[in-house]
């Protein structure tokens, strides 16, 4: 059995689903209350931090709750998590996936396969190989962007407790798209255009993506589309932030027009 298959698999990018070591996906109805899912997702999101006290978790997840209802909801949700992810655990045995020390809680990462962790590892390996072996770098970066199916925890888009992690993952994914597009620019400008377009679907204000797209169109001999790309970049930046493109982008436009 592969390492991934023997672990609890958690998918957070563009979806939220959990696959048990038995290969079966945990159904939505099995989780019961939404607060059970919220607590598990919170523990996933904060897994790289130190263990958090129960009161800290409650105040971040359900700030509107009083102490009594918060304690009750936490207890019910934690019981629900253990019941769903370790259905065969006896009541007296220690939980495999959640480390509890007194009133602090943390996920046991060594027993989990999490797509966003794998994405980050592949991006790091791609960046490490960038200068010595661009071919290997491209392989890792392609694997990473293929794993990125969409926003981190898309069903919690308005939850403050996962906003920072969502933005962090998006930024490193955008950087991976840009690096790949740069690697492809000279040999396959059409692929650079595709990659930069994918980056702009994640964030249509990402100026690096417009710039690479301009360069790629210019290399293909399509100056009108290169200029049109600049105009779109300028329009988006003005609308969203009230700013103009960077000097490097303006200079690229001047160079393209002069050819």
Put a short name on every predicted segment.
Residues 30-41, 67-89:
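DNA-recognition element of transcription regulators
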């Amino acid at each position: 059995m592969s390492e991934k298959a023997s672990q609890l698999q958690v998918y957070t990018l563009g979806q939220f689903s959990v696959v048990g070591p038995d290969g079966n996906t945990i159904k939505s109805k099995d989780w019961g209350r939404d607060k059970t899912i919220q607590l598990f997702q919170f523990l996933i999101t904060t897994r790289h931090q130190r263990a958090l006290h129960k009161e800290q978790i409650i105040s971040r997840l359900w700030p509107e709750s009083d102490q009594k209802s918060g304690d009750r909801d936490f207890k019910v949700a934690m019981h629900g998590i253990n019941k769903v992810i370790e259905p065969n655990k006896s009541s007296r045995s220690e939980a495999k996936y959640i480390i509890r020390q007194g009133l602090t809680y943390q996920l046991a990462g060594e027993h989990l396969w999490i797509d966003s962790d794998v994405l980050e590892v592949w991006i790091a390996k791609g960046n490490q190989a960038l200068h010595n072996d661009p071919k290997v770098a491209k392989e890792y970066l392609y694997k990473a962007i293929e794993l990125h199916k969409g926003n981190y925890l898309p069903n919690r888009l308005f939850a403050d407790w996962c906003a920072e992690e969502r933005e962090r993952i998006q930024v490193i994914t955008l950087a991976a798209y840009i690096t790949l597009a740069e690697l492809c620019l000279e040999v396959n400008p059409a692929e650079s255009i595709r990659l930069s377009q994918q980056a702009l679907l994640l964030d249509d204000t990402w100026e690096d993506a417009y710039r690479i797209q301009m360069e790629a169109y210019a290399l293909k001999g399509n100056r009108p589309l290169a200029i049109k790309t600049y105009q779109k970049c300028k329009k988006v930046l003005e609308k969203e932030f009230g700013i103009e493109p960077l000097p490097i982008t303006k200079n690229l436009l001047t160079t393209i027009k002069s050819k």
